[in-house]
Amino acid sequence: MIDTNIAIYAMEAHPALKGLAPCSPAISIISEIELLGKKGISAQEVSEVRALLEGFPVIPISDAIKEIAIDLKQKYSVKTPDAIIAATAQNLGLILITADKGFAKLNEVDVLIVEL
């Protein structure tokens, strides 16, 4: 599962992502909201984000994800969007690919930190 920042770097074809093995990642609905809800986003950027998202299953928030996110927030004091993204990865048994080193403290979640 990819974090919002990795989706942004993917759209920019960031060289740090070239070393990652090809996969068919999923993305949380939270990342979709973060990507499309950017203040001042242009029509061109919306088109680019939607084109990127077509290649990913967008995972909605289920009751199970909600409960895991609550547990993560209580245990680690993470921001709500990060807790939901991490909970989504944990619930699906996926590795969370991110550039945010803050996710490394979440012991319950398999995290791959991409160095930029």
Regions found by a protein language model. Give the residues of each.
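Short, well-structured N-terminal submotif of metal-dependent ribonuclease cores
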Residues: 1-27, 37-50
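Histidine- and aromatic-rich ligand-binding microenvironments
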Residues: 2-5, 27-28, 78-79, 100, ...
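Conserved glycosyltransferase catalytic-site signature
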Residues: 4, 63, 82-83
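A generic structural signal for short hydrophobic patches within well-formed alpha-helices
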Residues: 7, 32-35, 66, 103-104
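Short active-site oxyanion
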Residues: 21-24, 55-57, 90-95
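Acidic catalytic patch
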Residues: 55-75
